[in-house]
Structure formats: C-alpha cells, structure tokens
Regions:
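Alpha/beta-hydrolase fold catalytic core
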Residues: 284-429
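A catalytic-pocket lid/entrance helix-loop region that shapes and gates access to the active site
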Residues: 107-111, 204, 208-301
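N-terminal cap/lid subdomain of alpha/beta-hydrolase-fold enzymes
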Residues: 61-161, 439
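Conserved acidic catalytic loop of the alpha/beta-hydrolase fold
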Residues: 168-186
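Glycine-rich nucleophile elbow surrounding the catalytic serine of serine-hydrolase chemistry
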Residues: 192-205
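Catalytic histidine-centered segment of alpha/beta-hydrolase-like enzymes
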Residues: 457-468
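Short alpha-helix in the alpha/beta-hydrolase fold that links the catalytic acid
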Residues: 416, 430-440
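Alpha/beta-hydrolase fold nucleophile elbow
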Residues: 183-195
Length: 493
C-alpha cells in the first residue's frame, strides 16, 4: 500500500511538472476573448479584446514561432468595411508593444502622474483618449518580445532578427491576421515607434509588393533615420535644436531665451542650424578662426554648453556628452529618451551618463502594469515572462532602405499618407532630425501634401505627459479622418 501511494505521488508530481513545463513553452495558436467598455471623449465605447498567438510558418508550412498580439474591436459598429484598422508596433529592436499599448492608443493606460513619472500602487485605468472610438487596433509583439517566442529551436534565427527579415515575416503575419479577422475591406494604418518606424516604413512597401495589401496611412512616432545618411555636418547641426529644447526645459539658457515660448525659440534655432551652422561645419578644419569662434558662441547661447567646451569638441557635441554635461555643475545627468528626467551618476566626471534615467523610471511603472493587465483584466494567464526587451541580437542592420521604401510606397499608392510625431526633449530620435528625415524622404516635393509633422513638449514617448497624450491621440484621429478617401474617390494622380 505504501509503495502504491509512493507511485501515485511520483506520477502526480510528474504530471504537475509536465504541466508547468508546458506553461513555460509558448503555443503556436491560442486566444482568449473578453468583453469590456470604456468612456472615450465622454461617450461609452463597447469593445471586445482578443489576445493570444498566431503562428509564423517557414517555407514548408511548419510553425516555427508564435507571435503574440492583442486585438481591440469596437462591437457597436455596423459598417465594419468602412472602419479603420490600426496595426501597432514598438521598436528596439527587441521591444514589446507594451509602451503604446498601455500608455498611448489602447483602451487602458497605466497609472502614472500627469508628467509620466511612476506612482504606486501600480496598475491600469481607463484611457479616455484612446483612438478606439475611431479605429480598431491590434498591438503586435515581434518574435521574442512580449509573450512571443521561437517555438522551433532548430529554426535559423536570421529568419526573424534583421531589418529585412523582420519586415518580411511580419508582412506575411499581417496578411494572415487580416484574413482571419476579415478586415481586407477596411482602411488600414501602420503605427510604429522608434525602431518600429523603420519596421512600418518597410512594411508599407512590403505589404504592397509581396502581400498586395495597400494601406491608407503610416504614423511614425519618434522616428529613426530610416536609413537616410546624415553623418558629418548634417548630424552635428540638426541636433542643436534638441540641445536648445532640453537646455530651455532645465533653465540653462539666458533670461531672454528662457522668457520666450519654446516653439518660437526652436524655430529660430532650426533656422540657424540649417542656414548658418551647417555651412560652417561643412568646412571642417579649414573654417576661419573668427567664423569658428562666432559659431561656438552661438551654439553656446542655444545649448547651455560653454563656448570653451564646444570649441574643445570642434563644434561637434555628441548627444551622450550633452546628457552628461548640461547639468554637470548641479550634479545631475539628463535622460537620453526624455531629457526632462534627471539621473545621478557615481561621479560627476566623465563623458557620458552611467545609465538612462528615464528608462529605469519607465520600467518601474510599465512592468507591473502589463503583467497585472494581461492576467487580471484580459484573463490571459501564462507562466511565460513578458519580455519588455527580448533576446533578438545579433540584429542584421544591413539593407535599411526604409525611408526609400516609404517613398516608393507613397509614390505607388496615391491613398497613402504619412504623419510624424516627435517630442522636443527626445535625445535619441531627435525631433529636428525627424523633420530632416521627412524632407529627405521625398526629394521631388510631389508628396509633401501627404507628409506632416507634429511636435510635443515631452520626450520619446510623448504620450506619457497627459497634455500630449490628449493632443497626440487627437492628431491621430484627425490624420485618420483626413486620409480616408471620400466615397467613390479613385486612387490616381
């Protein structure tokens, strides 16, 4: 009898261990659906949330990865064909979709203060500014981010982790998703943040060329350079307006400049950077002494960095040095992704901060929120870890022609519009650099009526500041409405 009990105990233990092991391995396909409602702009919006996985197949049709997504569908809409679908990606590469999902466009947002700083208790609340009133949304986690995983360990990782590979498999995945949820008739939009802008710019063309899917709009939130070269004088000049914005925020400029409106001042700095500073920098070591000194003096006036230090750096202050130098005398660094944030280093000396002060703050608040939200609100229960940043390296960065891809997609599709959203205090993907990217996308000037830029008084994730959360979502609504063709309007030049 004792032996039988021991055998049963062993079998029970093995069965439990097996179940736990299964829970730690992502499955190719599963979904959980729940029903909710949220008040947006004062009106109740009923919606269905479906979260789960959809496979990525190799060329033989074998499932090799599971991509996790969350799809929000407004349920009181009769004309589904006319209802826009927004497909959302974050960046990294390697970042989950949590950032825009739980802080920007989704129906729930994390609990933070009005400037975006963490507060306790952690959790989520209704988002009265979500775009779900105007469009359905799917948030996608590329392979190895969020709950997405490789499920065939023998698969070549190069299938997923590179500029071109990423775009290729995700285009195929989007085709399958749109087919499964029956949204081919719907106007479709891509939104990407940071590296996600490289992704969606490439997807705009890949979807057209390989999946025969034409979209209505691309929204670039804090865009990368999209493969457009800006080394040398261009990069050194275009970062000055960001320096001015960060210095203005921290009261490091002259009283005259501090008393001016930020955007008014930035327009002046932009003009100087393009029209005067860039030609000086183009002369390199052959610039005259007086011209060099005058440029250093003007840069110091706009950046809050001393003229002496600027001259020591040959008029080329790197962003990482700026983050360390701006508040050095006060004993602080400033954040890379959002320079409103301050950090404290081990020592005030050095040429770059010890850590990104804004990122630790964001992880502080986002990680508890996303784990709580999936398990307790969406009823998605798993022992798999949500990868805020997943293992996707080495990442093949060769072949990044995403800016040109976007231009080609827009040229081939008269319906396609693009909007850029940037925060003035973003030191990683600087706002004036984003403007420069927009200018370079279309050298012909024939697409500029379909290209637009919006700036915000915050950083990389401008939506963390409540005032910008409201306006940025309104700008997306307006963009969607503007870019929808009138009934019967043909796609032609």
């Amino acid at each position: 009898m004792t032996m039988m009990k021991n055998m049963l105990l062993i079998l029970w233990t093995l069965s439990v261990s097996t179940l736990v092991g299964q829970d730690r391995e992502q499955v190719a396909e599963e979904t959980v659906t729940t029903n909710h409602s949220v008040v947006i702009k004062g009106k109740s919006v009923p919606f269905q949330a479906t979260t789960g996985t959809q496979p990525v197949w190799d060329e033989s049709g074998k499932a090799v990865a599971a991509v996790h997504y969350t799809y929000y569908l407004r349920t009181d809409v009769k004309n589904r064909a006319g209802r826009p679908l927004v497909i959302s990606f974050n960046g990294g590469p390697g970042s989950g979709s949590v950032w825009m999902h739980l802080a920007y466009t989704g129906p729930k947002i994390l609990k933070i203060d009005d400037e975006g700083f963490p507060i306790q208790p952690y959790g989520v609340k209704d988002n009265p500014n979500s775009i779900l009133d105007e469009a359905d949304i799917v948030f996608v986690n590329p392979v190895n981010t969020g709950y997405s995983r490789i499920i065939d360990e023998e698969v070549d990782r190069k299938m997923f982790f590179g500029v071109t590979a990423d775009i290729k498999y995700l285009a195929e995945w989007i085709n399958t998703f749109v087919t499964r949820v029956n949204r081919w008739e719907s106007p479709k939009y891509l939104i990407g943040e940071s590296y996600g802008t490289t992704r969606v710019s490439g997807l705009a063309l890949e979807l057209q060329n390989a999946q025969w899917m034409y979209i209505n709009g691309v929204i670039l939130v804090s865009p990368t350079g999209l493969g457009i070269d800006r080394n040398g004088p261009v990069g050194a000049a275009t970062r000055l307006p960001y320096f001015a914005a960060a210095a203005w925020y921290h009261n490091q400029l002259s009283e005259t400049l501090q008393n001016r409106d930020l955007e008014e001042m930035l327009a002046e700095v932009e003009g100087y950077a393009i029209n005067e500073l860039m030609p000086v920098l183009a002369k390199g070591g052959f610039v005259g002494k007086e011209e060099r000194s005058a440029a250093a003096k003007k840069m110091a006036e706009y950046s809050g960095i001393s003229e002496k230090v600027i001259l020591q750096h040959n008029l080329d202050i790197s962003p990482s040095f700026f983050w360390k130098e701006l508040l050095r005398e006060e004993g602080f660094t400033v954040g890379r992704l959002d320079s409103r944030y301050k950090g404290i280093d081990r020592m005030d000396g050095g040429s770059r901060p010890d850590f990104n002060s804004e990122l630790t703050s964001w992880l502080h608040s986002f990680t508890p929120a996303v784990n709580f939200y999936y398990r307790n609100v969406l009823n998605y229960k798993t022992d798999i870890k949500y990868n805020m940043f997943g293992p996707v390296r080495p990442w093949d960065r060769n072949g990044d022609n995403s800016g040109e891809d976007l231009r080609q997609a827009m040229a081939q599709n008269p319906y396609l519009h693009t909007m850029i959203q940037s925060g003035y205090y973003d030191g990683a993907t600087q706002y004036f650099d984003a403007k420069y990217t927009m200018w370079q996308i279309d050298p012909s000037g024939k697409l500029k009526d379909r290209l637009s830029f919006k700036g915000y008084r915050s950083g990389h994730m401008m939506y963390l500041r409540n005032e910008d959360l409201i306006s940025a979502n309104d700008h997306i609504r307006d963009f969607i409405k503007m870019s929808l063709p009138k009934p019967g309007e043909p796609a032609k030049y």
